[in-house]
Amino acid sequence: ECEVDAICDGENFLIPGIMEQVERTGVHSGDSICVYPAQHLTQDEIDTMVDYTGRFARELHVNGLVNVQYAVSNGKVYVIEVNPRSSRTVPYISKVTGVPMVDLAVRCCLGEKLADMGYGTGLHPNAPYVAVKVPVFSFEKLHGVDTQFGPEMKSTGEVLGIAPSFHEAMMKGLVAAGYQFKTPGPGSCVIISVKGQRQGRGPPSLPGSCTTTATRSTARPAPPSS
C-alpha cells in the first residue's frame, strides 16, 4: 500500500513524495510503518500514481490539499480512496521533504499559483536519505485491548528514523519506538511465525545455542495440495 499527499491550485499539482506502507493493505495507515521514498516501486508504478493523483485533484476541483491511498499488486496500481483534505501524514512528509505543504495549500486557497512558489509542480525530487515513520503503541498500559491490526487505528504516537539507507533508518525508528534488539546467544529463545504461502521454505539461519519455537501453523504446515 502506498500513500500520496498532494497540493493543487485547481490546475497544477505538487507531490512532495510517495510513501510506502510496510504492513499489508487493510491496516490503518496510522498503525503501519511508513517509508519515504518508496523502496519497492517501479518507475511505471510511480508515473501511474503521479498521473492518477493529478487527474483526481483536477476532477475534484481541489484547491488545497488532497490525499490518495493506493494498493499495488503485480505491477497494477489500484485506488483505495481519495480524500480532498489534509491527512495525518502531511506533517511527516512536509518534515522529511522540506516542502511546507500547509503553507503552500493556504496560499493556493488565497489565489496564488504553485508555479510561482518555487517548489515546482508534479513529483518533487527525492531527498538523499530514507525516512521511516514507526508507530508507537500503548498495549502495556491499555490492558485487554485487541492487538490485531486492522482498519481501526490503535497506535498512540509515532517516531521518525532518518538515515542514508533504508535498513539504518528502519533500525533507528524501531529503537526510538522502544523496541529492544539483542544478539541471540545461549539461553535465547526465538519465535518464528511464517505466512501461509511461505511455509515449507525452512527457518532462517539461527545460532545453534538458541531455543526455537513457532506458532502452530508454522510448526506443522499444511501438506502441499496435489
Task: State each model region's role.
Residues 1-200, 225:
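ATP-dependent carboxylate activation and anion-phosphoryl transfer catalytic cores
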Residues 203-213:
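Surface-exposed amphipathic alpha-helices with a cationic face
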Residues 206, 223-226:
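Residues within well-ordered alpha-helices
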Residues 215-222:
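Short internal beta-strands
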